[in-house]
Amino acid sequence: MIFGGAFDPLHQAHIYIAKRAVQAIKAQKLYFVPTAKAFFKSPIKASNQARLAMLRVALKALPQMAVSNFDIKAQNGFSFNTVQHFKQRFPNAELYFLIGSDKLSELAKWHNIEQLQKLCRFVCYERFGYPIDEQLVQQFNVRLLGKCPLDLASSEMFGSHKFRQIPAKVLHYIHQHNIYLKTILQTLLDEPRMQHCLRVGQLAKTLAVANKLDGKTAYTAGAYHDLAKQLPQAQLEKLAKVAGVNDYPSWKVLHSYAGAYILKHWYGLNNSAVFSAIWNHTVPPQKMSQLDMIIYLADKLEPMRVHEEWAKGIDITALVKLAKKDLKLAYQITLKYVRSLQKN
């Protein structure tokens, strides 16, 4: 059985459907075949190699399923070519092609659909919002699987709790390699703010390495530090309350708490060091970890800050240099300066 799609990202509905199809058809093997980026109708966010890797992580514990890189390797854009490839590979096998009801209405437009029907049989599951057209079922001799109970679409995973509907091991892999970091930022931030976040991430990584800390963790915390910065006040206050924050000097500091909460509870990033660094970057507590200090400094000292009015009273270049040798001293100097501005 062939199951094509972007899988960008793979989610629990994909796994549910695949298991249901294997069981219903009694298929010996189901192959996930990720579409080549150049041929998918919508922009694909993750690289070809990242999508293949995520699928392999997900399918390790599912021996009846495997990943095929045919479409990606061949830069193939037609399902007909995909099915031909599998027919050549398994000449005596009965081939099935798994589709959702959203694709059922498009079958008549598929390349070489008449020949394709001779090579395989279509198996269709019903997706939310795409009712089954019985006339098309008859026309294309489609076998129905029933309705998928999970209302999920890869295009709707970002900016909501639905991202948690990614298999746990895949979710861990995504965050380990920051596969969707820019996409997550773009969901909530405009371009200038996102670029600020990426610069903070880069400087945080540099400072972490200089202080013998993990650069990747620092980059992640730095890049995500302002994730919630542009949310409206009412939403920030609501998220802060849910996160347990009721006492704060101004609603403008709430993005740190909201951002940490969103990363953990929407996107499933369970890293206490990253959470702490983001949480503490607006109102630093008495006790700050090294990573906390690094994110605070990277936010205040990233390269473009030199053009901002508030930073004219400090030497950003000198403080960055100092932070590589004496992190705590650089933090204390910067914090003292920032607090002096707040008093004025």
Curated annotation (Swiss-Prot):
Q: Name one GO molecular function term.
A: nicotinate-nucleotide adenylyltransferase activity
Q: Where is this region: NaMN adenylyltransferase?
A: 1-182
Origin: domain of life: Bacteria
Domain HD, residue spans: 193-304
> What positions does the entry give for ADP binding?
196, 226-229, 255, 281-282, 299, 305
Could you list this entry's UniProt keywords, alphabetically sorted.
ATP-binding, Hydrolase, Iron, Metal-binding, Multifunctional enzyme, NAD, Nucleotide-binding, Nucleotidyltransferase, Pyridine nucleotide biosynthesis, Transferase
The EC designation for this entry is 2.7.7.18, 3.6.1.41
Pathway listed? Cofactor biosynthesis; NAD(+) biosynthesis; deamido-NAD(+) from nicotinate D-ribonucleotide: step 1/1
Could you tell me which InterPro entries the record lists for this protein?
Cyt_trans-like, Diverse_Catalytic_Enzymes, HD/PDEase_dom, HD_domain, NadD/NMNAT, Rossmann-like_a/b/a_fold, YqeK
List cystine links: none
Write out the ranges of the annotated region (Ap4A hydrolase).
Answer: 191-344
Q: Where does Fe cation bind?
A: 196, 225-226, 299
Catalytic activity, as annotated: nicotinate beta-D-ribonucleotide + ATP + H(+) = deamido-NAD(+) + diphosphate; P(1),P(4)-bis(5'-adenosyl) tetraphosphate + H2O = 2 ADP + 2 H(+)
Q: What does this protein do?
A: Catalyzes the reversible adenylation of nicotinate mononucleotide (NaMN) to nicotinic acid adenine dinucleotide (NaAD).
Q: Which HAMAP family match?
A: NaMN_adenylyltr
Which family does the record claim for this protein?
A: In the N-terminal section; belongs to the NadD family. In the C-terminal section; belongs to the Ap4A hydrolase YqeK family.
What is the name of this protein? Probable nicotinate-nucleotide adenylyltransferase/Ap4A hydrolase
Which organism does this sequence originate in?
Mycoplasma pneumoniae (strain ATCC 29342 / M129 / Subtype 1) (Mycoplasmoides pneumoniae)
